[in-house]
């Protein structure tokens, strides 16, 4: 039986941040700049796990495709999916974003850090002023959610 040769995935440019780097930068901005009363968190649903752990989490309600960040502000729920500049949504992510919208939540897909910050500003989560911009080398610690 002949094996099909797979074409390698194109390598990311050294100057293009990974999805993880974008995610961490967005969370840093939220920790430092989110309006008072905004709650945000990352539902850990997309990581690779051992089969036993995955089965336990699935039984507990972990669902594939949930947006990278869930935000709650002023009685509204937001789901933000983060992608690299050329990143694509999976089938499960498309379905979940549609389900969020049908349930009344606001959703968006951000391709890159600038897009994510623009969306969060448009939603009123981050202030529109650029006076509080985060320095690129800043590191924050603490929980991945904000408590008013």
Predicted features along the sequence, with ranges:
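Catalytic phosphate/metal-binding cores of nucleic-acid and nucleotide-processing enzymes, i.e., regions
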Residues: 1-148
